[in-house]
Curated annotation (Swiss-Prot):
Reactions performed catalytically: (S)-malate + NAD(+) = oxaloacetate + NADH + H(+)
Keyword flag Transport: no
Protein name: Malate dehydrogenase
Binding locations of substrate: R81, R87, N119, R153
Subunit structure: Homodimer.
Its EC number(s): 1.1.1.37
One Pfam family named in its UniProt record: Ldh_1_C
Gene giving rise to this polypeptide: mdh
Organism annotation: Salmonella newport (strain SL254)
Length: 312
């Protein structure tokens, strides 16, 4: 199994690479790519960790050598948020970066499963889909927006609030990956209940958690370490499913049946070809249903922005 990380010299990419070097199955290959000249050195640094995962680093304009033979590609390349910015302010820079990298994926490893971490995910996934479609290699079961950070934050915050072990809480999060489009389904956590006020406040905290980190870092960046952990969890789940493990379920932002929007984050059963089944979002509370209805315009606009970036 070969996993490529694009944007591997950045804060998320280095954290992700460290976790993958430690946790990928024995015999896996990990290839790191970034435009920054430090990238081969990051790979050498990680190569000293005694795990049976081969690692190589590549830098420069051309990601092709890193992508050859990749089964999974995780893209974290791009600029990070600064205080006062929201994820959509990143669009102008990051849209072009994602387009360029996905064009290289389309040529070099068109059958790979691709996880997009680069913000704004609501939009960059639509860009990636349109690029792959133009190249004639788009498979909607193999393109994912990585929203796992919303899930792990939800798990943490719920456990704190309710005095549970964080490892025992699993919150499904649906919708998109910014602001109001992030919808944790708090009503679906077994054995935990919330007052309406708790649910509203917790939902808001989960939606604004990225800003919490941006402000706490005081201009020094955005969520890199927790995002690295989230991306590693998703990437490792994908690898396990591709290798034939049964019953692997993760939420991610994918193209579905279009019931809510062209792309929508929902629980997915993963398998040997990527998405095996898009699972139902189940029964929502009145608060969740209202939040879902209220976000769809925003989500659809975000998606349209990505489609237009490629098609206009």
């Amino acid at each position: 199994m070969k996993v490529a990380v694009l944007g591997a010299a950045g804060g998320i990419g280095q954290a992700l690479a460290l976790l993958l070097k430690n946790q990928l199955p024995s015999g896996s290959e990990l290839s790191l790519y970034d435009i920054a000249p430090v990238t081969p050195g990051v790979a050498v640094d990680l190569s000293h960790i005694p795990t049976a995962v081969k690692i190589k680093g590549f830098s420069g304009e051309d990601a092709t050598p890193a992508l050859e033979g990749a089964d999974v590609v995780l893209i974290s390349a791009g600029v990070a948020r600064k205080p006062g910015m929201d994820r959509s302010d990143l669009f102008n820079v990051n849209a072009g970066i994602v387009k360029n990298l996905v064009q290289q994926i389309a040529k070099t490893c068109p059958k790979a499963c691709v996880g997009i971490i680069t913000n704004p995910v609501n939009t960059t996934v639509a860009i990636a889909a349109e690029v792959l479609k133009k190249a004639g290699v788009y498979d909607k079961n193999k393109l994912f927006g990585v929203t796992t950070l919303d899930i792990i934050r939800s798990n943490t915050f719920v456990a704190e609030l309710k005095g549970k072990r964080p490892t025992e809480v699993e919150v499904p999060v649906i919708g998109g990956h910014s602001g109001v489009t992030i919808l944790p389904l708090l009503s679906q956590i077994p054995g935990v209940s919330f007052t309406e006020q708790e649910a509203a406040e917790l939902t808001k905290r989960i939606q604004n958690a990225g800003t919490e980190v941006v402000e706490a870092k005081a201009g020094g960046g955005s969520a890199t370490l927790s995002m690295g952990q989230a991306a590693a969890r998703f990437g490792l789940s994908l690898v396990r499913a591709l290798q034939g493990e049964k019953g692997v379920v993760e939420c991610a932002y994918v193209e579905g049946d279009g019931q809510y929007a062209r792309f929508f984050s929902q629980p997915l059963l993963l398998g040997k070809n990527g998405v095996e089944e898009r699972k139902s979002i189940g029964t929502l509370s009145a608060f969740e249903q209202h939040s879902l209805d209220a976000m769809l315009d925003t989500l659809k606009k975000d998606i349209q922005l990505g489609e237009d970036f490629i098609n206009k």
